[in-house]
Amino acid sequence: LIQVNWDGETVWRFDRTELVEAEGEDPTWMARQHHDWQREGSPAGYYAPGAEPLVDRGRTLILSRREVLRPEITDKLLLDDYIVEVAWDGDVVWEWLPSDHVEEFGFSEAARNAIYRFPGWNETRGSAEWLHINSMSYVGPNRWYEGGDERFHPDNVLWGSRDANVIGITDRSGAIVWRMGPDYRDHPALAELGQIIGQHHPHIIPEGLPGAGYLLVFDNG
C-alpha cells in the first residue's frame, strides 16, 4: 500500500503483513491488501466537514488476508480476512482475525454445518474464502457514542462480510459488539428491513452530513 503526493513522490508505504515465498523467487514482504484501506481522520472514506484524512501522520487500517487452519470451522485451509492497523512508522498497533471469533457471528447450527462442508473452496488458490469481507472503516464520531453507547466508540471498526451477509462492529478487545445478520429474522426490526445480500461499504454517515449517525449500506441483492 503506497501513498504518493501530488508530485508523484512516495511519502508512505506499508508491505510488512507477510513474508511471502514463491517457488523460484526470493521471499518478498507483501501487505496482501484487498478491497479497502483507510487513513485516520476520514472514517467514511469520502469528504465530510472536518473529517479530512491525515496525510503526514496517523494510523492506517488495512484489509488484508491470511491463510489459517481452524478445524472448528472447516477441515480445509481458510483464506481469512485480516484487519491490521499500522502506525505512521509501520508498526502494527492492532490486528483482528474473524476466524478467532466465529462463535460471535450468530451462525445457526445449519449454517455452521454448511460452512464446514462448503466454505468457498477455490481449487486454483488452494484455500477457502469463507467470509469475503469487502469493506472496513473506523466507526468515527457519532451521536450513539455521545449518548453513552460504547459499542459505537469512534475507534471501533465497522466491517461487512459479503458472503456471510453480516455487518458488524469489532471493539479494541477483538469482540464483535454489534451485529446485523446473518439471519434477519432474529428481530422484528430486522424482519421489517428484510434480508441484505452481498452488501458493500457499510459505514456510519459522518457528522455534518444529512443522516449523520445512521448506517449507510449498499444492498447488492
Where are these regions (language model features)?
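Histidine-/acidic-rich catalytic cores in large beta-rich domains
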Residues: L1-G221
